[in-house]
Amino acid sequence: GSQTTTAKIGDYFPITENTKYVYEGMGNEYASYTVYNDYTEADKLQQRLNNGGTETVNIIQIFEGKLIKVFAESEIYYRENFLVKQDNDTEILLMEPLQKGNSWTLTDGRVRSITDTEASVSTPLGDYKAVEVTTESGNGKNIDYYAKDVGLVKSIFKEGETEISSSLAQIEKDVPLIQNINFYYPNINDEKIYYKNVAVNFYTNDVTREKLAQAYKGEPVANTGKVFSENTQINSLYLNDDGMVYLDLNKAFLQEMNAGAGYEAMILQSIANTFGQYYNAEKVILTIEGKPYESGHIALQEGEYLQVNYDNVIEGS
């Protein structure tokens, strides 16, 4: 009808916050997945897609009448804002005008076209009228359905007798992404490091370093000491291209630490393990206000890192 001619991509791909989408798969163990938007801007989102096998970060942008996947990377289990990133190879998911027959060729040679604007689709969550997008490749085809004010409601892959589908089963609003994170603490009495697994809630656009600092100030494992004192703050935290985690703390961390040399070394080991493990890295560069870590007992040289070490580590409670 006439209303579809003025339809905008934003109507069919809303940018949501604090919302979890659950897709039910058929035909393949990895066809079931969840989606959560870690970060959003006015016309752009960074989604975390978890299919039980891996977690993939996708950045999707609405730009000049196109819905474009500008960045994708799998095996990203940590939260980091990648909204500025862009791959050389971007993929147009949907394009205006949202009219039957609108067609475009992808960089890999596949042809994608709008094959219906009012397709009837049934999912476990309900029935929708959707824009149907068909992508033809050599052997098979993908069909994606976008419903107004909802977004992607169903995807189907067909090849010969094979059919794999993912259908929207649940939309959970006002919920966080929950990550289970190990926090490590030193026990000076037995000279061992204990960890406890903490469920940390991240809402859309939460700043990871702030949430981790807050969680690290929580109740430590019994008979262990605190690692982050009350006024400790993380100034910056990221996984660098060199594979090392860069962690910069404020002066309060040093000023409020009351530890002998051996205990201080255990505190630093606890930090290395906590942040190294979160980013699945082996090495952590620790600085204070941008300068190499230096206390009365321990001085790290420029570029000297703390090595993650799980020997003598015990699960606490």
Please give the residue ranges for each predicted region.
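Conserved functional acidic sites
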Residues: 3-178
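Bimodal "functional hotspot" detector
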Residues: 1-3, 161-317
